[in-house]
Design a protein with these regions (language model features):
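N-terminal beta1-alpha1-beta2 module of alpha/beta enzyme domains
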Residues: 1-61, 69
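Flexible, glycine-rich active-site loops centered on histidine and acidic residues
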Residues: 2-15, 70-117
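Glycine-rich, flexible loop/turn motifs
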Residues: 55, 61, 65, 99-107
Length: 117
């Protein structure tokens, strides 16, 4: 048995979230082990993973990445905790600084000293 893992980034472009259930289920049927979501365009990182946790219960879920600057610590902990409870043992949480484009340009938050935050 192989320990290899195969992942796909979700949500799929140009497909509404509510129409992606069959696609996500098919990923598991095709042998994919993981789905990953980020916050760059469109949906937040957590909603597609919450949906995938129900649509394909065998898939491991991961954020790649959630920006530390754009949510307060309590709100971020609530989001991670809720998804971890919805999919016990299946969540890999990635957090990072993101970029000045997303933090400052999109959210109007100063992107200062990103590695000290």
């Amino acid at each position: 048995m192989s320990d290899a893992r195969f992942g796909m980034t979700i949500p799929f472009d140009d497909v509404p979230l509510h129409e992606q259930a069959d696609w996500v289920r098919e990923l598991a049927d095709l042998g994919y082990t993981d789905v990953w979501s980020s916050e760059a365009n469109g949906a937040d990182a957590f909603t597609p993973l919450a949906l995938a946790s129900v649509w394909a219960p065998s898939l491991r879920l991961g954020t790649a990445i959630v920006p530390a600057f754009t949510r307060g610590p309590a709100c971020l902990a609530q989001s991670v905790g809720s998804l971890a409870q919805a999919a016990p043992g299946r969540l890999a949480f990635g957090i990072g600084t993101s970029s000045n484009v997303i933090v400052e340009g999109w959210n109007g938050i100063p992107f200062e000293q990103p590695y000290e935050r």
